Design a protein with these regions (language model features):
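Gram-negative outer-membrane beta-barrel transporters
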Residues: 281-283, 304-410
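C-terminal beta-signal and adjacent terminal beta-strands/loops
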Residues: 285, 330, 398-418, 427-435, ...
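Surface-exposed extracellular loop regions of Gram-negative outer-membrane beta-barrel proteins
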Residues: 1-2, 10-72, 132-135, 148-197, 202, 205-262, ...
Length: 500
């Protein structure tokens, strides 16, 4: 701040105003002597922190075992196979890093304290409360809030067969496996005393995949490749539970994911041009997703669990390189795709303060775009490979068709209930119905980001030492045009103010 003030007082003020007011946090914490009889007896004049810095832990213990075998057969045939085993245990917990001037943290669920009359209901560690008569007193380095473990067992056996003759190549591979996962709650949550501590339901899945690869080389300059695959994968632990920090409840409708993928590629390799043209098609079915956020309409922290999410990806990709003069080449790439949702997933909504489903509906996502990835990208540049292992390049990049990650609640019947009532009303005027229809379109419209372009350049050199070692140096400058308004992704707000 001193540096900015020397440069410009207005900038310094802006920087300071944008910072968190840690002075206020320290003063508030140091002056907060809790008058609760239990805390007064336990802690005396020690100050209770209302503000602090936490450190969220994801501590993994991961064991892997792999066995591979290979057999070369006659007539250019080879078979490779093996088996894999993975055992993973991950500890999830939050730890106090800094109490910001206070002496301790009283570990209770403040949202539950607001809504629940019973002291037991807002305990983060109910067993500790039963044993001591008060909530956990946490200091720097102590766990607080939540503590649970994720257990994962994965095993599979696989095989890969390849054969080639002349310009033709064939590859066939497959695997079959088993996946098991469950949650182990280390603390008993006061809101969910019977569904938070101990092991959850064991989730078991059969996994498999089958792949076929074909290739044919017409000549040294022309070749084609084709691949097709179908696989079934177990869902991720993060989407298997509606609120793993608080309880063992699994996501309703949870299924294994099914993936189909196919692609076709043509390769061109001539002295005056090198090119690669590919087309692809992929479908994903039965994905699941859990979004946790503060629901301002319910004044509670909520979990939005979706299942039956289907997606479709298809498109083309082109890459080329054209040498023009003494190591200088024109290079380019083009990628166009259409990534869309193809189903209306089911969802259930739960809140952390109630042990029941508060809302059940469908999300109208069919036809909307999959978020974040550019569905149109273009690159053209110059690439130079000089003597003595010098290299340099300059590239122009263009991106378009990038979409915002959607709030699923906006695409439910519940969110537009007020407007649909207007549309079906016999007393509403045409103007009111037109306004309601416009509001529905505004609510459900998916935001598309503006197109963007960047310019980058690089230069470098490699040194080979005794033909054994390589030492390299490279320098790259990206976004030379200093465009600071590029948006590559983001999330639609989860608050329902857009409805209002």
């Amino acid at each position: 701040t001193i540096y900015f003030y020397a440069m410009d007082g207005a900038i310094a003020k802006g920087v300071w105003d944008g910072m968190l007011d840690y002075d206020k946090f320290f003063q508030t914490n140091m002056r907060n002597i809790d008058t609760d009889p239990v805390l007064s007896k336990l802690m005396g004049n020690n100050s209770r922190s209302n503000y602090m810095i936490e450190e969220r832990h994801t501590d993994q213990l991961d064991y892997n075992l792999a066995v591979n075998v290979q057999h070369n057969m006659r007539h250019n045939m080879r078979i490779v196979g093996g088996a894999n085993l993975r055992v993973n245990r991950t500890n999830y917990y939050s730890e106090i890093k800094d109490l910001l001037g206070g002496d301790y943290w009283y570990d209770i669920d403040k949202f539950a304290e607001r809504d629940m009359a019973s002291a037991e209901a807002y305990q983060n560690d109910l067993d500790y409360y039963w044993a001591t008569g008060h909530a956990r007193i946490a200091r720097v380095g102590d766990k607080y809030g939540y503590y649970y473990r994720a257990h994962l067992l994965e095993t599979n056996a696989w095989a890969n067969y390849t054969w080639g003759i002349g310009g033709f190549s064939l590859g066939v591979s497959g695997s079959v496996g088993y996946s098991n996962m469950y949650r182990e709650g280390m603390w008993r949550k006061g809101l969910f005393p019977n569904d938070s501590k101990g092991d959850s339901k064991k989730l078991d899945y059969l996994t498999y995949d089958a792949k076929l690869a074909l290739g044919y080389k017409f000549s040294g300059a022309h070749s084609i490749e084709a691949n097709v695959a179908y696989m079934q994968q177990a869902p991720k632990f993060a989407t298997a539970f509606v609120s793993p920090r608080t309880r063992n409840t699994t996501t309703p409708g949870l299924k294994a994911e099914k993936i189909f993928a196919a692609d076709l590629t043509y390769n061109l390799n001539l002295p005056y041009i090198k090119a690669r043209l590919s087309g692809y098609y992929t479908t994903i079915e039965d994905q699941s997703k859990v979004i946790s956020f503060y629901d301002d309409t319910r004044s509670s922290f909520t979990n939005f669990a979706m299942s039956g999410i289907d997606k479709r990806y298809y498109g083309v990709e082109l890459g080329l390189s054209v040498p023009v003069w003494n190591g200088l080449s024109v290079v380019g790439a083009l990628s166009w795709g259409d990534y869309t949702y193809t189903s209306n997933p089911n969802f259930v909504q739960t809140v952390d303060n109630v042990d029941k489903i508060v809302l059940k509906d469908k999300v109208n996502w069919d036809g909307y775009h999959v978020e974040s990835s550019p569905q149109l990208a273009f690159n053209i540049g110059l690439d130079y490979r000089g003597p003595r292992n010098w290299f340099a390049g300059v590239n122009f990049n263009y991106y378009d068709n990038i979409y915002l990650s959607m709030n699923p609640m906006y695409r439910t019947a519940t969110a537009i209930k007020y407007y649909t009532n207007v549309l079906t009303s016999n007393t509403a005027t045409n103007a009111q119905k037109a306004s309601a229809l416009s509001s529905i379109k505004t609510l459900r419209k998916q935001e598309k980001f503006d197109s963007a372009y960047t310019l980058s350049a690089n230069i470098g050199k490699n040194w080979y030492i005794h033909r054994v070692y390589m030492l390299g140096f490279s320098l790259e400058v990206k976004n030379i045009l200093n465009d600071q308004d590029i948006r590559t992704g983001g999330y639609e707000q989860m608050r329902m103010s857009k409805v209002r």
